């Protein structure tokens, strides 16, 4: 099965549609959205509707911290970036229908299938929204996930960067630097953990959208970058009256 792994869409409909089209062209058979559908961007209702359609078609959709933020207008996380998200929480809440807000509230935090654990943040405490950003935090997440012996792969988002770690000889965790579009063999005799990047708000200085393809049959992972009309997405943020900083982020990828 070939999975498209998409995370951190952040109400960016332009980026989401571009990634979905790209994934289908690459032969993706199942879509998995790993949380943070909303926040920051100008199209929360449209993105939620698109993700509801993905779920109805048999795809996976998980809850992220920005779904929690919309529900409560607060989140248990000390990150300064989430306080910026809080600036749009009420606006985002008001754009969504009651049915959409309820659907976001009942989304699961994790999903497990085909040797994979899917999660928005860290598998060691999914509801705490911890970042997987280095060998130490990746190891914590991987250790928790692999308490289930069926799990060989952990895929998440949250950090808005693409990264890959694997457990080598013994228990040492190794970091692998991925290149976009290059299929990486991920044999099942090892344990792997990856962050798939952000569809709707990349933060590595490049505005192209990010997602990943995982072929569970061939045991290969491919990180993808997709060009989309990020200037139109930024203009929509401005026209919605949202903070200028969010528009600039789309233009610069930071």
Regions found by a protein language model. Give the residues of each.
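N-terminal active-site segment of His-dependent metallophosphoesterases
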Residues: 1-57
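Active-site neighborhood of phospho(di)ester-bond hydrolases with catalytic His/Asp-centered motifs
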Residues: 6-7, 31-36, 40, 60-65, ...
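Active-site neighborhood of divalent metal-dependent phosphoester bond hydrolases
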Residues: 48, 54-150
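Short beta-strand scaffold segments in enzyme catalytic cores
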Residues: 110-113, 162-166, 210-214
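Anionic-ligand binding region
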Residues: 137-154, 159-183, 189-192
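Acidic, His/Gly-rich catalytic cores of divalent-metal-dependent hydrolytic chemistry
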Residues: 169-254
